[in-house]
Every structure is written in C-alpha cells, then in structure tokens.
Amino acid sequence: MNIIDNFEQENISKLTANKKIPDFEAGDTVKVTVKIIDKAIEKDGKEKLTERFQAYEGVVIAKRNRGITSSFLVRKISHGEGVERRFMTYSPIVHSIDVVKYGVVRRAKLYYLRHRNGKAARIRERHITSAKPKAVKS
C-alpha cells in the first residue's frame, strides 16, 4: 500500500470509530439519518446554531466505492415526485445508516427506475433468515 492508501485507511477508521456502516447494495431500502445544523437569529440579534436529525428513506440506486470518497445514491418518491440524494458514506453529516429491506436486483446501477413509476418500480425483497443449528435427535 502506498502513502495515500494508508492515509485514507487511517481517516476511514477514525470516521467509523463511533458508528457502524452496514453492508448494503443497490436495490436495498435504507434509512439514512442526517445531521442538520440550523442557524436562527434570536430576538436580541444573536445567532444560535441548533442541531437536529432528519431521516431520509429510499431505495439505493447506485453505490460508488472509492475509499474515503465513497458515496451512494438514494431515491424516494415525495408527494408524487422522484427525489434523489447522494450521500458520502464516511461523511460526519451522516449520523446513521439502517437497512430497512434487502432487495433482489441483477444490476449494479438502477438508473432505469427513474423512468418507472408505481408497480413497475417495485423491487423483489430478499428474505434473510438467521441460520439456527438443528437439534440433534437421540
């Protein structure tokens, strides 16, 4: 590994020290909690910064793995309009990522979902079962 790769790995380990990033791929439905900082002006003229969290839930239509600059694109339907938002995977603004549903798709990039709506835009769900050891009959 060269110097740049070592630097990226160190920064990734620092950024993920207090949060867990799950394994997800295109077709999965994720819920991304984003930190939003609002600036409000009080009555006496002072600025006050308030911090809140906002959830964004949608289908991952693309994932880009490029070290510290990795990102993923999430699409959701809001008030009948398609909305896409790109999140940097290791950004400090991203508070948490939760996988809601696992989808079954045969493509890495699902840009074709932009032109589909309603039932045509559905993705089959992959059911994950935990492997339980079978009881031994004696």
Swiss-Prot record:
Keyword Secreted part of the UniProt annotation: no
Protein encoded by which gene: rplS
Short name of one Pfam family: Ribosomal_L19
InterPro entries: Ribosomal_bL19, Ribosomal_bL19_CS, Ribosomal_bL19_sf, Translation_prot_SH3-like_sf
Job description of the protein: This protein is located at the 30S-50S ribosomal subunit interface and may play a role in the structure and function of the aminoacyl-tRNA binding site.
Entry's Gene Ontology cellular component terms: cytosolic large ribosomal subunit
NCBIfam families, per database record: rplS_bact
Keyword list, A-Z: Ribonucleoprotein, Ribosomal protein
This protein's name: Large ribosomal subunit protein bL19
GO terms for MF: structural constituent of ribosome
Ribonucleoprotein in keyword set: yes
PANTHER family in the cross-refs: LARGE RIBOSOMAL SUBUNIT PROTEIN BL19M, RIBOSOMAL PROTEIN L19
GO biological process: translation
Positions of transmembrane segments: none
Family membership noted in the UniProt record: Belongs to the bacterial ribosomal protein bL19 family.
